[in-house]
């Protein structure tokens, strides 16, 4: 499994809406995994001054990450493979 970063531009989003999007990503990941499509939300970093959000997912392909976000109705600008450098 690889790590993928999802870039998002979210102008005007509230913290409540951001929390709801996070919950939707987590739940859709569980649903897809139960269907045999292993994809997992890891975490997000939000930059309020730029309305920019970067989210990390673990999946075998970027298409699974896109599918999760599309089905959860969470907009994104790109999905790229990344490295999660957790200490």
What are these regions (language model features)?
Residues 1-33, 47, 62-70, 84-87:
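Short S/T/G/P-rich N-terminal loop/turn motif that feeds into the first structured element of a domain
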Residues 38-44, 78:
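A short linear hydrophobic-aromatic micro-motif
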Residues 46-54:
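Amphipathic, hydrophobic secondary-structure cores in small proteins
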Residues 56-58:
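Short hydrophobic/aromatic beta-strand micro-patches
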Residues 74-85:
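Conserved short beta-strand edge segments in small beta-sheet-based binding/regulatory domains
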């Amino acid at each position: 499994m690889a790590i993928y970063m999802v870039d998002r531009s979210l102008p005007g989003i509230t913290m409540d809406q951001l929390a709801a999007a996070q919950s939707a990503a987590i739940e859709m990941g569980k649903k897809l995994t139960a269907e045999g499509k292993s994809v997992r939300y890891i975490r997000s970093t939000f930059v309020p001054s730029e309305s920019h959000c970067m989210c990390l997912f673990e999946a075998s392909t970027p298409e699974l990450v896109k599918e999760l976000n599309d089905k959860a109705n969470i907009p994104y600008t790109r999905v790229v493979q990344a490295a999660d450098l957790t200490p």
